[in-house]
Every structure is written in C-alpha cells, then in structure tokens.
Design a protein with these regions (language model features):
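Conserved recognition-core residues within compact binding domains
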Residues: 1-46, 53-93
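Short intrinsically disordered terminal tails
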Residues: 95-97
Length: 97
C-alpha cells in the first residue's frame, strides 16, 4: 500500500499500458477496472472508489470516471465533445433510461 492508501500489485501483464508509473506494478483498482472493461484505461479516464476506501478494490466498489469539459466551454465545443464521447463510449455503456 502506498502512502495515499492505494494498493499496488505486480502487474500480471508487464506490457500493460496502465502499469507505467512503477514499472512492473499497477494500482490494483486500475487493474480490476481494466479487467471489467476488457481493455486498458484510456487517456482521461480514472477509477473512483464509491465508498472512498482506497484499498477496497472490489469491482462493485469501483466506477469509471472521465474528465469532463471545463466550465465556460463554448456550446459548439461542448456539443462536439458530447458527440465524440457518445461515439467513444455509447456502445460500451448504452443509455438505459
């Protein structure tokens, strides 16, 4: 466990793109989420611990977060970003409501 409370594990896949901060190691919550998704995390994605306990890396306690447009963005830029976001994630996370 690191000083911030995150658990690091030996990366089962040494070439995993998310195992770059400590060569050969990966944050366990990142590994778990990448296994749930079936792919590495992409640029701008992060993993949030729902209960805020950083060593509770059960899949059901993790959420995939993505950085969003900054406040004050022009509407046309926000619409362009929203179209990109839906194209990027729409098939993985279909709208259910």
């Amino acid at each position: 466990m690191d000083p911030k409370g995150y658990v690091f594990i030996r990366c089962p896949d040494p070439g995993h793109p998310n195992a770059k901060s400590k060569p050969g190691w990966i944050a366990e919550h990142v590994w778990v989420m990448s296994q749930v998704l079936g792919r590495p995390l992409r640029r701008g994605e992060s993993v949030h611990h729902i209960n805020n306990i950083k060593h509770d890396n059960r899949a059901e306690n993790l959420e995939l977060w993505h950085t969003h447009q900054p406040k004050g963005a022009r509407v046309e830029d926000t619409v362009r970003w929203a179209r990109w976001f839906l194209a990027e994630y729409g098939a993985e996370f279909p709208v259910t409501s």
